[in-house]
């Protein structure tokens, strides 16, 4: 068979491409088999080497003889061929062992590098997680501080707003201002009958109410309360009767009826305004009376406290004087027994 292969190789010299690949897609030959004479690329050379362990592969050189015929010589040639085959097989096995050891070393080094990279990645991830947790804790603490500050500022703002815009405080301030005379700043303790207004004690003396008829708060309150409040009721009854009479007159036009209604309601509105003013006067007078009453009570309490303070001061002075008078007597008593003892000794 070797002779047949050699004859084929002599008839068909190698063209420099891989004999196993497709002719149209065959790459350049890199190795050649010395036993069978075929040229191979890198991939097919490795496959041929693994399949035929006894074949000898060498680097392909263009123009060189690809096939080396076996030496003829009968029985003498057989040992040489066996030795050559054994050497080739040993070389192939050694090459395969070296390749396997290299692949094992490479795989071990790759595994070690992968484990190192994994450990580094894990440490990096842990450090990143720790840093993220620290950042989150810091952000939470900052947010809590900001919330506390905002709550305090809001509470302060609410208290300030309540103190500034509390309607009860404003109403109380208005009441206090109404209880004082706008001209003199004194309590409103007198009532002007002509102007129907509360005034202080200085208004009829040096103010705008000089020469006016005055009355006390109690008198003004009783007078306003005793007045008949049936004026509004009488005005309403009179309005209804006039409207009936006017509407029954066929000579009255619609425009005249509108004018009449407006005039009558103006009269009723005036009566209502008078009643409203009367009620407001009653409230103001009653409030002024309460203020005056409270003022009188406070004045009585203050005078009583002044009397008590005076009595306490007098009692303290008497106690001090009695203590001062008692001190010389005690000194005389102490000197008396000592002088008597001295006389007895003499």
Swiss-Prot record:
GO molecular function, one term: zinc ion binding
Zinc finger (B box-type) stretch: 176-217
Record-listed Zn(2+) binding positions: 181, 184, 203, 209
Segments of this protein annotated with the region Disordered: 68-167, 313-346
Quaternary structure (record): Interacts (via coiled coil) with TRIM17 (via coiled coil).
Function, as annotated: May play a role in the process of differentiation and maturation of neuronal cells. May regulate the activity of TRIM17. Is a negative regulator of PAX6 expression.
Protein name: Tripartite motif-containing protein 44
Provenance organism: Mus musculus
